[in-house]
């Protein structure tokens, strides 16, 4: 799907909704936290035998494939954390990301299944994995074939998850990409 077609569907009313959500801090106050805050909160959850699930990505142009991925991820544990890549690190083409980080945070935070949303301080999720120490790190099936990983980071992510005694899970949700 081309960016022009997507822009038709993302009209001014949609953008206005996102901006209003940000201004009103709709759902963000309770869900959007710093990485360090969520890492501390996770310690308490782990002490209470709660399973921590972590997803990481851009989540620009949130679509049904993202939703199914998040639904499938949540089934693996009690607490679902979604970390987002900062705008400066996104290389998905001209005029991308379409939605700025704050808008992407609002979209993800609005999903009931998501417990916390954090921004990754770096280009990769390695620091997030190291600090959160999730029981499960969930990636989409498009990362299952490691040799096809466009980011070339999945190998490092798997090593980091192993180092914190977690498990990598690949969802079976159908692939839908907003950057293809």
What are these regions (language model features)?
Residues 2-180:
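Nucleotidyltransferase catalytic core that binds NTPs
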């Amino acid at each position: 799907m081309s960016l022009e077609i997507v822009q038709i569907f993302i009209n001014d009313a949609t953008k206005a909704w996102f901006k209003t959500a940000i201004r009103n801090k709709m759902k963000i106050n309770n869900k959007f936290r710093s990485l360090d805050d969520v890492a501390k909160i996770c310690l308490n959850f782990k002490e209470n035998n709660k399973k921590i699930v972590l997803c990481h990505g851009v989540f620009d142009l949130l679509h049904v494939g993202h939703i199914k991925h998040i639904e499938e991820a949540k089934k693996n544990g009690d607490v679902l954390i979604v970390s987002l890549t900062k705008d400066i690190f996104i290389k998905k083409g001209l005029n991308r990301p379409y939605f700025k980080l704050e808008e992407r945070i609002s979209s993800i935070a609005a999903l009931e299944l998501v417990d916390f949303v954090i921004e990754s301080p770096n280009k990769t999720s390695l620091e997030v994995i190291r600090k959160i120490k999730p029981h499960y790190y969930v990636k989409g099936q498009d990362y299952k074939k490691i040799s096809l990983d466009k980011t070339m980071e999945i190998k490092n992510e798997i090593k980091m998850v192993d180092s914190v005694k977690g498990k990598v899970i690949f969802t079976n949700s159908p692939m839908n990409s907003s950057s293809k």
